[in-house]
């Protein structure tokens, strides 16, 4: 008989031992929660054109929750470090979620009551500080460079959100002034400038006011081809406005979408997708008025 051949009796004996091991293994830890149903019922398309971009077997996941968290906002993804940075405005800190093990740790404290965050195309973090009424950049060594603090010799109201132009690396930001309305999310003080959208030139540092034809400019983003700028109005407008980008100027401003009919009270962060570029369709997160795009 071939020595490598296992006879039937030995095979059955081995299988019996293996089966016993499986039978005595620890019972699975069933939590009692209902299994996740796909597609996730919390993924809702207000426009049916968005349906084809859903990933049907992906649920909405909570990355962070804490009884100490007061108001988390301004998330920005770092594609090199594979981490998400976000602000807790009243707690005056920034937190970081790391992809490899889902841990969340304090990233920066104090943060100047930062709200919106983003990264430029050299990987440096840009933050809008409510408490100090300015836009700053964090260098590779962690030092802070002030990019915008005043305009026409007056302090900004409280910069809120920023986006970096992919073509010329300029920084475009909104200044609605929420961080100066109370001490809860900044430092209470008078608003000396009309709420507006601004641009910081990447080379000269010159600050240009682009438009103040909006009540409370909040979240903002460019269309994928950079030809248009979307800005959400979290004030009386409760809408998303869009302008044509003409170099360093905006023109032909108009309402892109009204948010007044949404049950969620407001829009916050805006983002566009390349696939929807033909329609220049931004997506948003509603939270209390027109907020982020």
Task: Label every PLM stretch briefly.
Residues 85-102:
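Beta-propeller domains
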Residues 2-18:
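N-terminal secretory signal peptides and thylakoid transit peptides that target proteins
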């Amino acid at each position: 008989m071939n020595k490598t051949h296992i006879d039937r009796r030995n095979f059955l004996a081995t299988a019996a031992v293996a089966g016993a091991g499986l039978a005595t293994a620890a019972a699975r830890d069933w939590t009692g929660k209902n299994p996740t149903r796909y597609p996730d019922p919390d993924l809702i398309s207000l426009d049916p054109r968005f349906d084809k971009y859903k990933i049907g077997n992906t649920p909405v996941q909570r990355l962070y929750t804490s009884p100490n968290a007061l108001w988390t906002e301004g998330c920005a993804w770092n594609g090199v470090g594979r981490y998400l940075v976000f602000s807790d405005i009243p707690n005056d800190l920034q937190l970081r979620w790391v992809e490899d093990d889902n841990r969340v740790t304090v990233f920066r404290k104090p943060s100047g009551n930062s709200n919106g965050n983003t990264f430029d195309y050299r990987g440096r973090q840009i933050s809008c500080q409510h408490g100090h009424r300015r836009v700053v950049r964090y260098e590779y060594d962690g030092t802070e460079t002030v990019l915008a603090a005043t305009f026409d010799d007056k302090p900004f109201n409280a910069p809120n959100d920023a986006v970096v132009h992919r073509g010329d690396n300029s920084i475009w930001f909104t200044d609605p002034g929420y961080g100066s309305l109370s001490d809860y999310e900044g430092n209470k003080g008078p608003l000396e400038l009309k709420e507006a959208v601004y641009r910081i030139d990447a080379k000269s540092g010159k600050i240009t006011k682009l438009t103040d034809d909006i009540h409370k400019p909040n979240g903002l983003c460019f269309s994928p081809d950079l030809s248009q700028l979307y800005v959400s109005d979290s004030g009386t407008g409760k809408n998303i406005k869009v302008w044509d980008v003409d170099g360093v100027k905006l023109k032909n401003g108009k309402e892109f979408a009204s948010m007044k009919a949404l049950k969620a009270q407001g829009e916050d962060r805006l983002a566009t997708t390349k696939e929807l570029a033909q329609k220049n369709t931004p997506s948003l997160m509603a939270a209390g008025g027109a907020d982020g795009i």
